[in-house]
């Protein structure tokens, strides 16, 4: 039943207007993979009978077992539209054949870095929302990410079969439930809207909302019904669609449409009367095996003739599933919606180039990307590495933005740390093969033009997680911007092999793990431990399983207890200016520390303010939003740690000699100090260090880096200690769904774990409550299992990293909670148990 060949797909790749790159995004368990199945079935990769049960895009064994998607998987679909379907289509197109590159992404929050990787290489998104659960926390996160990447969303309200079979909703109740979901989604879209995208809100009457039942493989948009009724009412499809949603009522006796309900029994809302009721009648007739009534209805709908003779013999649910699939096939409604309302690469790259390209927006590369020019220079972004079947090699998966990539072509690989004009993070290598991803298998093609997704073989030695590829001659090309992840790796474990001789395997395995997951961080501590950092418990569990089974060939490893990263900050200004002398006693540095204004550290994290900004723009933001003095805002020497972190060092000195010569040394000391704070050698966050005065030796030889760097670091530590230092701990935002009777259990578990509930909502029309709470990450281990035990498995938690919270107790006071934590961290790192006293860092005149 395969309906297309690889050559057909390859031919379509040249027609940019006929390509749609889209990802499927949603909250966990709202039915993305199941819905993707019916789309894949349309392209003839699996049989319709199995659609909904296969979850073809869940390619790993653990994904099939757990029933969750872990990695995002790409698949290319070929779809032929009829002239009838394209009647009013105004966009540009070449012929009726369309190529849809679809990426199914995970919904679970621990894997949201996979979603980011998927969004970067697509132009449109199908947002799936469960009609009963509504818009959840993860729906909001992925929508925000999509709009940030300038990706146009369309909405589908999924699992509507539950309205008919489980909940037995009245038509009016169902309409209100759907309307509420659409309103909630539109609020999010309006909040994070980007003016370059135009209006991103979705409306059923515009055809940008569909209603689907993924498991049963049927779906519809208002267009389907409007076409059916337009002839009967003697109007055109567009006017009919407006009548089928919103406050439009039809009275069957007077045969008139009104805007208000007349009060007569025969007067009903358009949506309820012409869409919900007919579906309900068909489903009920099929479920009750009332075949005479059912087949009469189907003959009126011109569906009866499409049913195969053996299908007419089915009973109950299988009959209902088959009838609905024949009448309202899911792929037609959804693919039609994507083709009509999602942009082609030629259209999307015009407005996406600003958020994609690092360099000047008028050079040859930006222009080629903007015009999606197949004859221009090659620009390709690799957003993730996919392990091949034998686990040893990786495919580099990404999207070609301009030019074309071919087998045997030499390319320049520019990693995330590449700076134009330097040799760092730069390789020139040959592509061995270009392949297309088809879910579980790969198909080789000769070359791929821009606007398409592709996987490359033979570059895995040179790309860690992501990279930009160009032609080998393009030496002035800039990279495509790095991805911003919405979660940060805050949970860490140390790993070691059980048998010491397996150490080389572990090191090699960690290298491969770092490639295969866009977010995980693998580092070696000074103590020689191997550390893996991930987004949460589940993320780490999957990473460790991959490491042991796939990347180390089953060699056994020991894993430490999970450890949480902390940050160090200050909550007051230094009570006096501290002074440190250099080892040769010829130079003195005076410094003080103060906390950043609220929201400034977050702004730096999000990249709104950074070291590469235009100083004028930066000082404007700092003075207007955070109340900085305009002069002071121009005197920021550096951000740190890693030159981009949420701390800064500023220069408030007046007329000091030789200051410029020691600037580099002070900045180097600041990077060192902000990476390892004074309390427990954790990163600092939200501290501004001010250089108040400097007294230097007149002779250059006596004020070299060896004298200044340790001195500056000591004075920063002293400044931190005098400004009321505090520990910051990471806090999760937890969303819990549970029925009313389980609420008591939820509250008691949260109280034991220092959690704090700040919102509780009952879902209208259901007995289910939605709780939102803050929970410290350090308390979250085993939280899920404790919660399920306390509520007999009725509560479902979702944790996502939210913010850093200062701990109330003073870490310098012996016996306080923070002090105990500091001692534990220092013991683990092999430092002296007591943090050093102020007198070690501060000198007297």
UniProtKB/Swiss-Prot annotation:
Keywords: Cytoplasm, Elongation factor, GTP-binding, Hydrolase, Nucleotide-binding, Phosphoprotein, Protein biosynthesis. It holds the Pfam family GTP_EFTU. Residues 17-346 form the tr-type G domain. Its EC number is 3.6.5.-. Phosphorylation by EF-2 kinase completely inactivates EF-2. PROSITE patterns: G_TR_1, G_TR_2. The modification Phosphothreonine is found at residues 57, 59. It comes from the Eukaryota. Gene3D superfamilies: 3.30.230.10, 3.30.70.240, Elongation Factor G (Translational Gtpase), domain 3 (3.30.70.870), P-loop containing nucleotide triphosphate hydrolases (3.40.50.300), Translation factors (2.40.30.10). GTP binds at residues 26-33, 158-161. One of its GO terms (molecular function) is translation elongation factor activity. It catalyses: GTP + H2O = GDP + phosphate + H(+). GO terms for cellular component: cytosol; ribonucleoprotein complex. It is found in: Cytoplasm. The modification Diphthamide is found at residue 702. Belongs to the TRAFAC class translation factor GTPase superfamily. Classic translation factor GTPase family. EF-G/EF-2 subfamily. Catalyzes the GTP-dependent ribosomal translocation step during translation elongation. During this step, the ribosome changes from the pre-translocational (PRE) to the post-translocational (POST) state as the newly formed A-site-bound peptidyl-tRNA and P-site-bound deacylated tRNA move to the P and E sites, respectively. Catalyzes the coordinated movement of the two tRNA molecules, the mRNA and conformational changes in the ribosome. This is Elongation factor 2.
């Amino acid at each position: 039943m395969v309906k297309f060949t690889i050559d057909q797909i390859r031919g379509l790749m040249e027609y940019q207007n006929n390509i749609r790159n889209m990802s499927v995004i949603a909250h966990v368990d709202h039915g993305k993979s199941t819905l993707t199945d019916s789309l894949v079935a349309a392209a003839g990769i699996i049989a319709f009978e199995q659609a909904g049960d296969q979850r073809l895009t869940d390619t790993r064994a653990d994904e099939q077992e757990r029933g969750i998607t872990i990695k995002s998987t790409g698949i290319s679909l070929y779809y032929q539209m009829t002239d009838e379907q394209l009647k009013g289509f105004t966009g540009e197109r070449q012929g009726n054949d369309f190529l849809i590159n679809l990426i199914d992404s995970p919904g679970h929050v621990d894997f949201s870095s996979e979603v980011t990787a998927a969004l970067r290489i697509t132009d449109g998104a199908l947002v799936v929302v469960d009609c009963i659960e509504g818009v959840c926390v993860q729906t909001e996160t992925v929508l925000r990410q999509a709009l940030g990447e300038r990706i146009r969303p369309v909405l589908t309200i999924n699992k509507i079969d539950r309205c008919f079979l489980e909940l037995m909703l009245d038509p009016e109740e169902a309409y209100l439930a759907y309307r509420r979901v659409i309103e909630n989604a539109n609020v999010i879209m309006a909040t994070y809207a980007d003016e370059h995208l135009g209006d991103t809100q979705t409306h059923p009457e515009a055809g940008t909302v569909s209603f689907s039942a993924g498991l049963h493989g049927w779906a519809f948009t208002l267009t389907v019904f409007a076409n059916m009724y337009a002839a009967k009412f003697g109007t055109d499809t567009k006017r009919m669609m407006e009548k089928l949603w919103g406050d439009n009522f039809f009275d069957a006796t007077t045969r008139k449409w009104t805007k208000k309900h007349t009060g007569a029994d025969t007067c009903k809302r358009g949506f309820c009367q012409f869409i919900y009721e007919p579906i309900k009648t068909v489903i009920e007739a099929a479920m009750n095996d009332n075949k005479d009534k059912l087949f009469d209805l189907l003959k009126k709908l011109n569906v009866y003739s499409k049913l195969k003779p053996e299908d007419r013999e089915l009973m109950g649910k299988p009959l209902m599933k088959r009838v609905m699939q024949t009448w309202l096939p899911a792929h037609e409604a959804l693919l039609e919606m994507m083709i009509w309302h999602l942009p082609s690469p030629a259209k999307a790259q015009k407005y996406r180039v600003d958020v994609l390209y690092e360099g000047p927006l008028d050079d040859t590369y930006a222009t080629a990307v903007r015009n999606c020019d197949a004859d221009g220079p090659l620009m390709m972004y690799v957003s993730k590495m996919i392990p091949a079947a034998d686990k040893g090699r990786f495919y580099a998966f990404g999207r070609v933005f301009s030019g074309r990539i071919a087998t045997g072509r030499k390319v320049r690989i520019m990693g995330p740390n590449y700076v134009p004009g330097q040799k760092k993070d730069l390789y020139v290598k040959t592509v061995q093969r270009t392949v297309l991803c088809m879910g579980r298998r790969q198909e080789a093609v000769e070359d791929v033009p821009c606007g398409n997704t592709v996987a490359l073989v033979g570059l895995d030695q040179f790309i860690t997680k992501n990279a930009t590829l160009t032609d080998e001659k393009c030496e002035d090309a800039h990279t495509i911007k790095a991805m911003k992840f919405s979660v940060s790796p805050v949970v860490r474990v140390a790993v070691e092999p059980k048998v010491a001789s397996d150490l080389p395997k572990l090191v090699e395995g960690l290298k491969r793990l770092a490639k295969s997951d866009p977010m995980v961080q693998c580092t070696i501590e000074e103590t020689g431990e191997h550390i893996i950092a991930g987004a949460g418990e589940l993320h780490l569990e999957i990473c460790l399983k991959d490491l042991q089974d796939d990347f180390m060939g089953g060699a056994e490893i020991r894993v430490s207890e999970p450890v949480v990263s902390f940050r160090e900050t200050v909550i007051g200004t230094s009570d006096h200016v501290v002074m440190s002398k250099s080892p040769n006693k010829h130079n003195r540095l005076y410094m003080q520390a103060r906390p950043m204004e609220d929201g400034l550290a977050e702004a730096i994290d999000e990249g709104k303010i950074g070291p590469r900004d235009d100083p004028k723009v930066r000082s404007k933001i700092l003075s207007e939003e955070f109340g900085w003095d305009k002069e002071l805002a121009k005197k920021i020497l550096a951000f740190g740690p890693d030159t981009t972190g949420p701390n800064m060092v500023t220069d408030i000195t007046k007329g000091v000699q030789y200051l410029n010569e020691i600037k580099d040394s002070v900045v180097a000391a600041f990077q060192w100090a902000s990476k390892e704070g004074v309390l427990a050698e954790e990163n600092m966050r939200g501290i501004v260090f001010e250089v108040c005065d400097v007294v230097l030796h007149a002779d250059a030889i006596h004020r070299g880096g060896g004298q200044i760097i340790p001195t500056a670091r000591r004075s920063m530590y002293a400044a931190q200690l005098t400004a009321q230092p505090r520990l910051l701990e990471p806090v999760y935002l937890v969303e819990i769904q549970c029925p009313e009777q389980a609420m008591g259990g939820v509250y008691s578990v949260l109280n034991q774990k220092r959690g704090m509930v700040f919102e509780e909502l009952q879902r209208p029309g259901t007995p289910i409550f939605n709780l939102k709470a803050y929970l410290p990450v350090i308390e979250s281990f085993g939280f899920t299992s404790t919660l399920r035990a306390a509520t007999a498995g009725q509560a479902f938690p979702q944790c996502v990293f939210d913010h850093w919270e200062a701990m109330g107790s003073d870490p310098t006071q012996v016996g306080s909670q923070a002090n105990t934590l500091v001692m534990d961290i220092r013991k683990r790192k092999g430092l002296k148990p007591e943090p050093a006293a102020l007198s070690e860092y501060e000198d007297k005149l």
